[in-house]
Amino acid sequence: MEFSIKSGSPEKQRSACVVVGVFESRKMTLPAELLDKASGGYISDIVRRGDMEGKAGSTLLLHSVPSTLCDRILLVGLGKEKDFREKEFASAIRTAVKVLNETGAFDASIFLTELPVRKRSIAWRVRQTAMIALDATYKFDQFKSKKEEIRRPLRKLTISVERRNELAPAEEALAQGLAIAEGMAMAKTLGNLPPNICHPTYLAEQAQAMAEEFKLGCEILDRAEMEKLGMHSLLSVARGSHQPPKLIVLTYKGARASEKPIVLVGKGVTFDTGGISLKPGAEMDEMKYDMCGAASVLGTMQAVARMALPINLTVVVPATENMPGGNATRPGDIVTSMSGQTIEILNTDAEGRLILCDALTYAERFEPDTVIDVATLTGACVVALGSIATGLFANKDALARDLLDAGEDANDRGWHMPLWDDYQELLKSPFADMANIGGRWGGAISAACFLSRFTKKFDWAHLDIAGTAWKSGADKGATGRPVPMLAYYLLQRAGKLN
């Protein structure tokens, strides 16, 4: 889809469709009023009759409105004006784009971006509109032999700004929003791919292709190289699989060489059976999504490279399958991590932390400013937070606040979870430095505590996305989260968030 920014009055738009809003109860927004005036009260007559009440999520498509230059006008219900905030704005944009895609209009001009959202700039509104528009039209159907094609899909969206002095910040925000949306789409596609295709080698190939396209540094470590580094915790997870494990490293240099990099570490378990501690068969297919942490950091790297942010960024992805087999790790095995700390593996289905701990130790060599790991780590986090908020842990409160703020800005929220020393007691082992599980209670916290033992040399945050990385049910599929949160955080760090 093509996007453009324009400043102008709605009644003067030569477009296949113009989109304007109506609040409850039947209160037209200024762009709607301008169209109504041009049409001699045609729209207000329809609204008065009750065809459009302004309820949130409602729409009404009008054809050939008198004395207007557009073919169609789409009225979008916005709900109560006093309640119109970020969530309502996003919902209105998503509704509008989905309906537009089915109207037969090749191009449209959207005036919802002119609506004030408390404490949000025009740049925020445009950036969000671009992100939502691409996300709303995303489809994953490459394995369908018969695809459901939209006869005349929307091909061009013009985003309106009220004043000409808003054009420059809106153009910059549009480019940012499209880059973030494309990063989300990449993360979603990697997550949605079947595990017989998206295995560790495939992930490595995608990273290499991205490195070539965006002139990134790329290094792929194989099993032998990881053995030399002493990554026995990571490799213990790979022992049951015929698919070779990979450690994927991408580097982006947008700032001075002296500036310390931010490192993103993404869990890349491309299929998780649980290993010898086998999962139940029901819904095991969804364990292809256990690499969504890897997908999200790769998508974030793509977004940063597209935006050409003035930062240094490194992405590390430990990638493997977790399979049962004659050579698979057993409950009770003890391994030595790259850090030298020993781990008693009481449950082979708590494998994410076993690959992440070695990746976090590996990250030390970059002398990072900050390290953020992203992982579909624990079912306990889903129990605690459901599918709304990502679980956020950090060894520095300031870092946690920055990520929480980024999540609020991006409509990709997180919740700050405790990382108190009291919980470290849960990981005690009589035979090794630590166990890889901490018992039934506080599972998301004990998992984060485990990882914290490998992060003593840098500021670190952990995002548990087990509840937010994908959806089940009728809308089954990867969500692309937390690419928006991470991208907004990096935009803020780069001083490019308006």
UniProtKB/Swiss-Prot annotation:
GO terms for cellular component: cytoplasm. Disulfide bonds: none annotated. Keywords: Aminopeptidase, Cytoplasm, Hydrolase, Manganese, Metal-binding, Protease. The active site is at K279, R353. Its cofactor is Mn(2+). Binds 2 manganese ions per subunit. It catalyses: Release of an N-terminal amino acid, Xaa-|-Yaa-, in which Xaa is preferably Leu, but may be other amino acids including Pro although not Arg or Lys, and Yaa may be Pro. Amino acid amides and methyl esters are also readily hydrolyzed, but rates on arylamides are exceedingly low; Release of an N-terminal amino acid, preferentially leucine, but not glutamic or aspartic acids. Its EC number is 3.4.11.1, 3.4.11.10. One of its GO terms (biological process) is proteolysis. One of its GO terms (molecular function) is manganese ion binding. It is found in: Cytoplasm. The keyword ATP-binding does not apply. SUPFAM superfamilies: Macro domain-like, Zn-dependent exopeptidases. Belongs to the peptidase M17 family. NCBIfam families: PRK00913.1-2 (NF002073), PRK00913.1-4 (NF002074), PRK00913.2-4 (NF002077). HAMAP family: Cytosol_peptidase_M17. This is Probable cytosol aminopeptidase. The lineage of its organism: Bacteria, Pseudomonadati, Pseudomonadota, Betaproteobacteria, Rhodocyclales.
